[in-house]
Amino acid sequence: MILVPLSEAKTYLRIDSSDEDTLIDVLLTSAKQICADVARLDSDKWSVISGETENTDTYTDEELERIQDVMKVAILYTLGYLYEHREEADHHDLVMTLRNLLFAIREGVF
């Protein structure tokens, strides 16, 4: 399972053609990384959330589903922001919004 496939990203952005697939794919990869960084997820937890590896003892099924739902919204929001503000993106505002979106799943750092 891919958390946000290219086809879903294009639907979210309301893009029908394949002319910008490469750009959207790059922005989608960046959006995923930005969201993982803001949520303070290490690579092991991110691979479980993104569906790259099987969930073993990291999360319960309910926790994983809730986290995936939140991450999906955050990734799509970030993708839309990066796509619409390619030239003048304010990354500080983006990160502050993502912190609020991802607050419930953010990992604590001590």
Predicted regions, residues:
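Divalent metal-cofactor coordination and adjacent catalytic microenvironments
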Residues: 1-110
